[in-house]
Amino acid sequence: MREDLKRWDEKYRESEFHPDQEPSTILKKYVRLFPKGRALDIAAGEGRNAVFLAEHGLAVDAVDISRVALNRARKLARARGVRIRTIVADLDRYPIPGDFYDLIIDFNFLDRRLISGIKKGLKSGGIIMFETYLAGQRSFGLDRPSNPKYLLEPNELLRLFRDFRILFFREGVFKEGGSRRAIASLIAQKIDPRPELSEELKRKVL
């Protein structure tokens, strides 16, 4: 963990902080799907998504390996008049509390070992919003990232969450934030035994 922490802290120190950065497009588009309650932002970075969730009334835990990034996240939260709880942790070993969160988001970070923890960490009826890069970036004319360990195979997100109710899925090259990205995006619900709640959520998607 120590080497990764140092590497990411240095990366953030060398980068300029942009407090006006926008949250992820999928979050903004599907804000109506946000439940009430607790949210977890995995690999939260400088907090753009965590703060957006807090602005919509969620109690947010923002987890990242970089203390520098999370300091910036707290600064952003204060500037926006909200609170988030920051947790410095190695996500390779982070134990997500079971049956605890109403919403979990994971953007631009892939560790397949975390998937079971994400599923267990969501309450019944809870929502996962997941978006990260696809394998074969160069075949799309893109050059980052390149390590296949951290890239999704085609339809992999659908397979990983096949036991959830899929509310939204897309996969391909999309232009967002002024750049082209080869990504997969998924919103899914941990199946709730009360079908009326799931039907209500479906109507919100449509």
Mark where each language-model region is.
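Conserved SAM-binding strand-loop segment of SAM-dependent methyltransferases
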Residues: 80-91
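Conserved beta-strand signature within the Rossmann-like core of class I S-adenosyl-L-methionine
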Residues: 126-133
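Conserved SAM/SAH-binding beta-strand->alpha-helix loop
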Residues: 66-68
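Core SAM-dependent methyltransferase catalytic element
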Residues: 172-206
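A short acidic, Gly/Pro-enriched loop at the edge of an enzyme's catalytic core
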Residues: 94-103
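A short, conserved alpha-helix within the catalytic core of class I
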Residues: 110-122
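Conserved class I S-adenosyl-L-methionine
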Residues: 1-34, 37-45
